[in-house]
């Protein structure tokens, strides 16, 4: 059975034991968000800004949850401070599932500057990340990176660029 890109992301989250997700609306992640929202085993909290989501997820982690945030990479720029301070200083794990806009094939020019900067921002913040090219790679990457996040108490990111969808 062929698994589509959204199903693979959702399956990766389930495989990884993610039981708490926050999200910011994103057209590329729409189907994944619908799957997460329909799953009673995953508490899903939609938020209006990424920084709010990271705060909610930090509290969920402290309550014993395995957390993820689903967001666009434009929100990564908004979240540098919370990642560099709260998450890094207090060793809070989280899996970031990021719709990576602004990469090759992007139709919206306004997305390109942040698209170019995303990998550099993650490297500067010392956040491990992967850019899977297929549904199978995405599912595997989410599991492996979530394991790294939980073992090291660090944020990790899965970047899903335009070609992934």
UniProtKB/Swiss-Prot annotation:
Its EC number is 4.1.1.79. It catalyses: 3-sulfopyruvate + H(+) = sulfoacetaldehyde + CO2. GO terms for molecular function: sulfopyruvate decarboxylase activity; thiamine pyrophosphate binding. The keyword Lyase applies. Disulfide bonds: none annotated. Keywords: Coenzyme M biosynthesis, Decarboxylase, Lyase. Pathway: Cofactor biosynthesis; coenzyme M biosynthesis; sulfoacetaldehyde from phosphoenolpyruvate and sulfite: step 4/4. InterPro entries: Sulfopyruvate_deCO2ase_alpha (IPR022502), THDP-binding (IPR029061), Thiamin_PyroP_enz_TPP-bd_dom (IPR012001), TPP_dependent_decarboxylase (IPR051818). One of its GO terms (biological process) is coenzyme M biosynthetic process. It comes from the Archaea. Belongs to the ComD family. NCBIfam families: sulfopyru_alph. Involved in the biosynthesis of the coenzyme M (2-mercaptoethanesulfonic acid). Catalyzes the decarboxylation of sulfopyruvate to sulfoacetaldehyde. Heterododecamer composed of 6 subunits alpha and 6 subunits beta. This is Sulfopyruvate decarboxylase subunit alpha.
